[in-house]
Amino acid sequence: MTTHPIHLHHDDPAHGGERACMSRRSFLLAGGAMVTLASLPGTAVAALKALKADYPAVKIGKLSRLKTGEPLEFAYPYPDVNNILVKLGAEAGGGVGPQADVVAFNQQCTHMGGPLQGTYKAKHQALGPCPLHLTTFDLTRHGMVISGHATESLPQIVLEVRGDDIYAVGVQGLIYGYSSNRAGR
């Protein structure tokens, strides 16, 4: 088998006037270097730190005051991040309370950040459709997409019950517009 070196020149008539910008050997060496760099310990440590973000515990409501199908809005983990707390009346993924039916979700569509305020449908236990591209989310299944353009579930607010008080203690999923939920925009 004969091999031909590949040069940066684009004027070789034998190859239609175009040549690749890199030899196979150079490509394999560069690819191997990238894999090696990606596996360095510093990269893995940064990823683990992102998974262990510390969130403040914030009291957001009382179990005794929640009515089935009537959502309450609250801000968490930042003052400008709007969320919804709702008692669904049926067991839900990530739900708290005696029936595991109290859940909380961020109110920005994960597709393009469309506002979901006022779109809760108690009959279907869903949030949406988003006014931008009609994505709808199932609140009984960790906010997964029912229909529409979004490919990610809604960020779910992690809840804790202490007596009658409900606390937001974390966020499961990335809030739209943030590179990291605890690192800011």
Curated annotation (Swiss-Prot):
Domain Rieske: 69-168
Coiled coil: none
GO CC annotation: periplasmic space
Signal peptide feature range: 1-46
Cofactor binding remark: Binds 1 [2Fe-2S] cluster per subunit.
Enzyme Commission no: 1.-.-.-
Post-translational modification note: Predicted to be exported by the Tat system. The position of the signal peptide cleavage has not been experimentally proven.
Record Pfam families: Rieske
SUPFAM superfamilies listed in its UniProt record: ISP domain
Binding site for [2Fe-2S] cluster: C109, H111, C130, H133
Cofactor: [2Fe-2S] cluster
Gene Ontology terms for molecular function: 2 iron, 2 sulfur cluster binding; metal ion binding; oxidoreductase activity
InterPro entries for the chain: AioB/IdrB_ssu (IPR014067), Rieske_2Fe-2S (IPR017941), Rieske_2Fe-2S_sf (IPR036922), TAT_signal (IPR006311)
Keywords, comma-separated and alphabetical: 2Fe-2S, Iron, Iron-sulfur, Metal-binding, Oxidoreductase, Periplasm, Signal
Compartments it resides in: Periplasm
UniProt family annotation: Belongs to the AOX family.
Its job: Involved in iodate respiration. May accept electrons from cytochrome c551, and catalyze the reduction of iodate (IO(3)(-)) to produce the chemically unstable intermediate hypoiodous acid (HIO). This intermediate then undergoes abiotic disproportionation to yield two molecules of iodide (I(-)) and one molecule of iodate. The resultant iodate subsequently cycles back into the reductive pathway. The initial reduction of iodate may inadvertently produce low levels of incidental toxic H(2)O(2), which is detoxified by IdrP1 and IdrP2.
Subunit annotation: The iodate reductase (Idr) complex is composed of a molybdopterin-dependent iodate reductase (IdrA and IdrB subunits) and two associated peroxidases (IdrP1 and IdrP2).
Protein name: Iodate reductase subunit IdrB
GN (gene name): idrB
